[in-house]
Curated annotation (Swiss-Prot):
Class in the EC hierarchy, top level: transferase
Ranges where the record places region Disordered: 848-874
The family this protein is said to belong to: Belongs to the herpesviridae DNA primase family.
Zinc found in the keyword field: yes
Name of the protein in its database record: DNA primase
Localisation: Host nucleus
GO molecular function: DNA-directed RNA polymerase activity; zinc ion binding
Main location: host cell
Main function: Essential component of the helicase/primase complex. Unwinds the DNA at the replication forks and generates single-stranded DNA for both leading and lagging strand synthesis. The primase initiates primer synthesis and thereby produces large amount of short RNA primers on the lagging strand that the polymerase elongates using dNTPs.
Zinc fingers typed CHC2-type, residue spans: 786-824
Length: 874
């Protein structure tokens, strides 16, 4: 006798099916019991005609896994002719037929584990055979079945879960319960659209389980469930292979990209968007549909080849050192032969060794400039009584025979040989003094306090160790003496930049760096600086690049070693890097210098040194150089000087760190590093000719490429929220923020900021600074105290903004701040929190306001006509 044909069927009943199962096993059938077949996994039924059928009845489980979504409850052995009407949904199984064909022995065996579990801790064990034990525990077994299976389900639940049309319902139900496809119902529903283009009849009129079973049994798609299951398996395998291939492609390239965290997220997003955007997804879906998937190579992949070649080429060239400078950096220069911009014309080495300068506080500067404007308004240009005006005056040259406005500050005898003067800042007696210098013996003083070896034919690291400074621990007694230990140079945008002065801060983690590691970093910086300067003009291999390392903090006397390492800095390595621009070249303008620093930052990110030391760097891709020091009114500390603490203590002296590997004798290098003329922004290096070629633009064309491409792939937004608000509500942006948004922001602000920071927002005003930007201003000033930290200098220099982002669904208002302190990211915008206002609320409010206005006008008109006497609402 041939083996029976095994068919699985998902069943449901018109009564409590848990009770009905136990009744059938215990031969106590309910006469009103009916069992319906909802779906099955049988091949075309005419193929099994005349055979014996083993019909396995299953119920949906409550706890699902990809391999077990329904459970076997009963097994029937019956002829195929008896099974066909049930499987087609034509005839339900009655209690008598179920009892006739039921495999009771198998059913009792399937309940044995449940019986043993229920009697595990029972004091009195049930007696008798398996049937007797099941009868004894019948109520508990029924309760267990109800917890394991979905026993009370309706036709509406099946339709809403698996599909409201015939094709989707039939294919998804059979594949989900009987073929073990590891995916969700939603995925199977999407796969049916690739399997067949027809949807079949609607199931909206189906209300009973009997009708639902008849739909499945009579459907033409019931014979294609096995083919659909094979297609789904093949499609999911290919999808997984494609996704893994895309991930490998992205990850393999990502490992070579020195990106910051934000840029790394954008790159991954864009790379995936190239492969999974709408157009690509539709093309790939067409290639992997039922009729096309067999034509694809079995082991090949498709999606990685769909990456935008322009995007891939840009990423390759932009993040490769050899092609970045050549293809993505644009430099514009201009030669000026007649009266070109000139650097400082002062006396950096007076013969008598005396300093000639004017010094004063900010009030003194303002007073002198006001007096200058009052008495000499007709003799020359006027200067505003601010630091910018002071810098303009210091950098202004006058013609011979013309009155010099600097005579307001310095005697005419001093000004005979000088024109453009530097302006310094000096910290003395807890005050800031502004100093305009005409003659300065700073270099002579350095020769006295810095001891250099007579033999400079030493390796760079040995020469660095051989240098020694005479230490100074406290502020000096007079301002003239203090200028030798505390001095900052102000950047003057009116003058050309002849020496590139870089402020390098590298945040580190873990143990301090060794001397060799620091020297490797300096060599890398030197190499990239020279590489970039060659875009401006010719640069020799022995071009000087001076490094000044911030001195280490004092060692802990309790844990001091016998021999201290060269550096014990933790948290940050600070350097001042200074190099003259190519001979005859200079940079003019703040934007050009900042562009140079930005390109240098990108070059440093492409170096192997930083990637090799990434385990000792806090954040790869974080800015190394501070580009904010190249604005009017910003100053930077000079090499060899100290940082002045509160109370007058001196610390963190910037000391020379020798990095000049191209020359064996470094005597001239060390000598020039001690000359103030070589250390200032606008001073000409010793031995350099006056500049004739001026660079006025340096830009990285691909700097915002990732941001722009990300914006292009995001859903479109309304650029002008102000116009939208005014169009719907008739309110300007400031009035809308003040009346509708600020109360909600205040309730969130009370929990988002420290308690002592909240009162400053009780009285504020608003100022629109852009179409989507509103600045929050303090009632007694524009700015606020820092919301994140309590800084040493507790001045209120934090700007607060509300940034509005509008989509068709909602307006998102983000509360942001900018703090100037380095601890807060040096003026980097910080988002604190956001609230969302549904767009429907704005539209509804506008419509309500319009209806109210219309109603009031109508009532007013009616009352004037005399036809109505009701009054207007308040």
């Amino acid at each position: 006798m041939s083996a029976p044909v095994v068919i699985k069927a998902l069943v449901a009943s018109n009564t409590d099916i848990a009770e009905a199962i136990l009744d059938a096993i215990l031969s106590r059938p309910d006469e009103g019991f009916r069992l319906f077949c909802l779906c099955h996994n049988a091949s075309p039924l005419h193929h099994v005609a005349g055979s014996l059928v083993e019909l396995q009845l299953h119920l949906p489980k409550k706890r699902l896994t990809s391999q077990s979504r329904c459970g076997l409850v009963l097994t029937l052995h019956l002829p195929a002719e008896e099974a066909f009407p049930f499987l087609r949904g034509l005839t339900p199984l009655t209690a008598d037929r179920l009892s006739t064909y039921l495999d009771r022995a198998g059913a009792l065996r399937s309940l044995t584990p449940l019986v043993e579990l229920l009697t595990l801790s029972a004091k009195k064990q049930p007696q008798g055979d398996a049937r007797g034990r099941v009868a004894w525990l019948r109520p508990k077994i029924v309760g267990c079945l109800r917890r394991i299976y979905r026993v009370n389900i309706s036709a509406r639940w099946f339709i809403s879960t698996f599909g409201s049309h015939e094709a989707q319902f039939v294919l998804v139900t059979a594949a989900y319960y009987f073929w073990g496809i590891p995916c969700t119902i939603e995925t199977l529903a999407h796969l049916t659209e690739l399997f067949t283009s027809e949807s079949g009849q609607s199931l909206a009129a189906v209300t009973s389980l009997a009708e639902l079973g008849e739909v499945f049994g009579s459907s033409a798609w019931a014979e294609q469930t096995e083919a659909f299951a094979h297609f789904a398996h093949e499609k999911l395998r290919r999808d997984s292979r494609e996704i893994r291939a895309v991930a490998r492609t992205i990850d393999a390239y990502r490992g070579r990209l020195p990106l910051a965290s934000a840029d790394l997220v954008r790159y991954v997003y864009l790379a995936h968007a190239q492969c999974f955007n709408e157009g690509t997804f539709k093309r790939y879906s067409q290639l992997t549909s039922m009729g096309e998937i067999g034509c694809l190579p079995s082991g090949g992949v498709v999606l990685p080849s769909l990456l935008d070649r322009g995007f891939a080429e840009h990423m390759r060239t932009y993040f490769t050192r050899e092609t970045y400078l050549a293809e993505h950096v644009r430099v514009q220069q201009l030669k000026i032969r007649m009266e070109p911009p000139a650097p400082y014309t002062w006396d950096p080495d007076p013969d008598d060794g005396l300093m000639r300068a004017w010094a004063g506080l900010s009030v003194d500067v303002a007073r002198e400039l006001v007096e200058l404007a009052r008495w000499h308004a007709d003799e020359g240009p006027t200067y505003p009584p601010t630091l910018q005006g002071f810098l303009c005056l210091a950098g202004q040259a006058t013609c011979r025979g013309q009155w010099n406005p600097k005579e307001q500050f310095l005697p005419p005898t001093v000004l005979r040989r000088v024109q453009r003067l530097p302006v310094f800042l000096c910290h003395f007696a807890d005050r800031h003094y502004f100093v305009m210098t005409a003659a300065d013996p700073f270099s002579s003083h350095l020769a006295e306090v810095v001891s250099t070896p007579t033999n400079c034919r030493l390796p760079d690291t040995c020469l660095t160790r051989a240098l020694s400074y005479t230490p100074v621990y406290y502020s000096q007694n007079s301002l003239s003496e203090q200028l030798f230990v505390s001095r900052h140079e102000y950047f003057n945008p009116r003058l050309p930049v002849c020496n590139l002065v870089l402020d390098l801060d590298l945040k580190i983690k873990g143990a301090p760096w060794s001397l060799e590691e620091i020297y490797d970093l300096c060599r890398t910086v030197r190499r990239e600086v020279l590489r970039l300067m060659r875009r401006l003009g010719p640069v020799s291999r022995a071009h000087p690049v001076y490094f000044f390392k911030s001195a280490c903090p004092p060692a802990d006397p309790d844990n001091m070693e016998d021999v201290l390492p060269f550096c014990i800095c933790t948290g940050k390595l600070g350097f001042r890097v200074i190099t003259p621009l190519p001979r005859g070249h200079a940079i003019v303008g703040t934007s050009a210098v900042q562009g140079f620093v930005s390109v240098l930052q990108k070059l440093m990110g492409l170096t192997a040194c930083l990637r090799r030391m990434r385990h000792k760097i806090k954040e790869i891709g974080a800015p190394l150089f501070d580009s904010g020091v190249y604005h009017a009114g910003r100053c930077i500390r000079l090499p060899h000087t100290y940082k002045v603490d509160r109370g007058g203590g001196l610390s963190r002296q910037l000391r020379l760190f020798v990095c000049h590997p191209e020359e064996e004798d470094k005597h001239s290098y060390v000598k020039n590093a001690l000359n103030i003329q070589n250390l200032l922004h606008h001073s000409l290096h010793v031995g350099w000719p006056a500049p004739k070629t001026f660079c006025y633009h340096i830009a990285d064309d691909g700097r915002d490429y990732l941001i722009q491409r990300t914006r292009e792939t995001l859903p479109p937004t309304v650029e002008n929220v102000c116009a939208m608000i005014e169009g719907h509500l008739g309110l300007d942006l400031v009035a809308w923020v003040s009346s509708c948004i600020w109360p909600s922001l205040m309730s969130t602000l009370a929990t988002a900021v420290p308690e002592d920071k909240f009162p400053q927002f009780l009285h504020v005003t608003f100022e629109q600074t852009g179409p989507n930007l509103v600045q929050v201003c303090h009632a007694r000033g524009r700015n606020f105290a820092c919301l994140r930290h309590t800084h040493r200098a507790s001045s209120k220099n934090v700007r607060v903004f509300l940034v509005l982002y509008y989509t068709s669904q909602a307006i998102t208002v983000t509360f942001m701040s900018q703090c100037f302190a380095g601890r807060c990211g040096a003026n980097q915008p910080t988002a604190h929190f956001s609230i969302s206002v549904p767009a429907s609320r704005i539209i509804n409010r506008a419509e309500a306001s319009q209806d109210s206005t219309t109603s009031q006008l109508a009532r007013r008109r009616d009352r004037q006509d005399g036809s109505f006497s009701e009054t207007l609402p308040n």
